[in-house]
Amino acid sequence: MELKELTAVELGEKIATKEVKVREALDSVFAEIDARESEIHSYITLDRERAYERADRLQQLIDSGECKSPLAGVPVAIKDNMCTKGLLTSCASKILGNFVPTYTATAVKKLEAAGAVIIGKTNMDEFAMGSTTETSYYGVTRNPRDTTRVPGGSSGGSAAAVAANECFYALGSDTGGSIRQPAGYCGVVGIKPTYGTVSRYGLIAYGSSLDQIGPLAKDVRDAAAVLEAISAYDEKDSTSLDRKDTSFTAALREDVKGLRIGIPADYFGEGLDPEVASAVKAAAKVLQDAGAVVEEFPLAHVKYAIPAYYTIADAEASSNLERFDGIKYGYRTEDYTDLHDMYKKTRSEGFGTEVKRRIMLGSFVLSSGYYDAYYLKALKVKALIRKAFDEAFAKYDLIIGPVAPTTAPKLGESLSDPMKMYLGDIYTISANLAGIPGLSIPCGKDENGLPIGMQIFGDCFKEDLIFRAAYTYEKIRGKF
């Protein structure tokens, strides 16, 4: 097996036993980047020189026995909406095209403490607003499985980099499916943990009540190991949870015997590609044959998830993005007459079309006369969806469904039809509204050879059950 085909944990084991040097791991990754990046465009920024400097320092620590993390020396890519000290963090936007943070996001710091080697910042939809990684100011990312198609979004660069062996794992963020949907399109594993499990400090906010950081990885074991490394209480994040149950790799030792798994009939209705439906139901049958109890059930209110999500997320975005005005940092227009004109032109020139669309929508639903009609109503729907999941998890340990209605669309299709882009997250959004964890795992391919993703939901703090089911499935069916 070539070095590039190893998983992150497998590579970490070989580095720990001195079979592979950290520099060799970097050589493997950068060879793939040099060969494929011009076509795929997974990255906005590469940090090659500093990566090799860190590799040399880590090698000394590993050789001396001072660094024993399972991820020590393993190259990682970071989505470009997480602050990295001394390294451009653009959020794929013109308005942050020259922003170099003076501090590092907590989740990234946790990886650094575990001995990770950061190789660069991945492309994404601008300010994480999109489902295709086509709204980036720095150009589109292509799906490594078929370069005529999108990788999904908004963490499309991270998913594509993992799928193309341009890194061994990556971090992404998930506001409405932005880890799970690109993982499904690119045929990798991605998990959004329970809200508050991973610190959001240093993550450039889109929808603060929905955003969560998580890993994209080659397999389930890698995803569990990375999530374990980045999960911790952080006093710098007011929504951070002090959990004592984040030994996710330990869950991989258990199977699914006796687990109750529900399949929402509402997720298998009109608009779902028959090939996707068939693959997901076949995957559920694999778990049933492995000892789980599987049955269909109705999941109330999920049909209202999309309008509720876009109302809440865009309202929060319109507030969060007010800080980008060209005064202290970022892009500033050169041609202006007064302060008001400078604000107007800076934001008009600095933000892309999709971001401006969502800012306007968010401002509208928060405006006087419409707050109760839209925003308050959306919050009530969010509460109803959370209640529906509470009722479901009183009966089932896990819920299984598709990640997306179809496999990866062609490039350009969603840009010409924004509703198609929004509907691409129809099955993932509910987890963010409810705050529950969800994982995407490959479960087959369509007639064109494109990956199909299965999504596994658990109740809050039940990532261990999700990993048990995902790992059991992966061991039985293998990797697609």
Task: Report each predicted region and the residues it spans.
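Short glycine/serine-rich loop/turn segments
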Residues: 72-213, 264-266, 315, 401-419
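Short, conserved phosphate/pyrophosphate- and ester-handling motifs at nucleotide-, phospho-/glycolipid
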Residues: 18, 79, 219
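Residue-level signal for inorganic ion chemistry
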Residues: 29, 51, 104, 223, ...
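Short, surface-exposed loop/helix-turn segments at secondary-structure junctions
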Residues: 94, 98, 239-244, 334-341, ...
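Structural helix-boundary/capping segments
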Residues: 35, 164-169, 173-271, 277, ...
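Short alpha-helical scaffolding segments that buttress acidic/His motifs in well-ordered protein cores
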Residues: 25-29, 308-309, 355-363
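Short helix-loop capping/hinge segments that flank enzyme active sites or metal/cofactor-binding pockets
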Residues: 71-91, 250-262, 315-386, 437-453
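An N-terminal boundary/leader segment
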Residues: 1-52, 289-291, 479
